[in-house]
Design a protein with these regions (language model features):
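Active-site scaffold of zinc-dependent metalloenzymes
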Residues: 1-7
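Short helix/loop segment immediately N-terminal to the Walker
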Residues: 2, 30-31, 65
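An active-site-proximal "capping" alpha-helix that borders the catalytic cofactor pocket
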Residues: 44-61
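Long, well-structured alpha-helical subdomains associated
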Residues: 56-152, 156
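Extended, compositionally biased alpha-helical segments that mediate assembly or anchoring
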Residues: 139-192
Length: 192
């Protein structure tokens, strides 16, 4: 599925992640305050997780309506690949925690498989189902202001398991960069 990792899908994932930050529940449904206050130190990672999964949810719905071109497989495969990229920066901060929860949530639901050579393959139907379920789970946790539920979700799924850790180490051993570094400035442009 390597051919399904595309710039356009990565750009859409990033753009709709940012759009999703502005959507969703800001105040708990019981009217007792903000989601941020209710979820305390757990709110940041869950908000990042919400933005990621609702971004993919929006992509899916727009694609179904014919408003977004390309292959849905491009978006899903690129989305999974983005988890590997992001987790390499660290699994302990908000984005990393959200990525680990999502990766393990997807794994538990068979949204992807891993072969003996360490190649991952997205199962489109199971990925779609897991995306829908995780979207609903996160929105419910936020709406209910369920601090204990959010903390339990992170404790259960927000862990870097040995197999993924080994796969990430393989990427590092091959000197595959975490991100692109652009050289900029007057000297690079020959203006000095």
């Amino acid at each position: 599925q390597r051919k399904h990792v595309t710039f356009d899908a990565f750009f859409a994932d990033t753009m709709f992640h940012e759009v999703a930050h502005g959507l969703g529940i800001k105040n708990t449904l019981d009217g007792k305050g903000t989601v941020r206050d209710a979820l305390k130190e757990q709110s940041s990672w869950l908000e990042e997780g919400k933005a990621d999964i609702l971004g993919l949810y929006m992509i899916t719905r727009l694609h179904e309506k014919g408003e977004l071109g390309g292959s849905l497989e491009d978006y899903y495969v690129t989305f999974l690949t983005g988890i590997f990229r992001s987790v390499r920066w660290g699994a302990a901060e908000a984005h990393g925690q959200a990525n680990m929860v999502r990766f393990n949530y997807f794994a538990d639901r068979g949204a992807f498989s891993r072969d003996a050579q360490g190649h991952y393959r997205v199962d489109m139907a199971k990925m779609r189902k897991a995306m829908d379920e995780l979207s609903a789970d996160i929105l419910k946790l936020q709406g209910d202001g369920n601090y204990a539920g959010v903390k339990a979700l992170l404790a259960e799924l927000g862990v870097l398991k040995p197999q993924l850790s080994a796969d990430l180490a393989r990427l590092g051993a091959r000197n595959i960069p975490v991100d692109v570094r652009f050289e900029q400035g007057k000297a690079v442009l020959g203006l000095q």
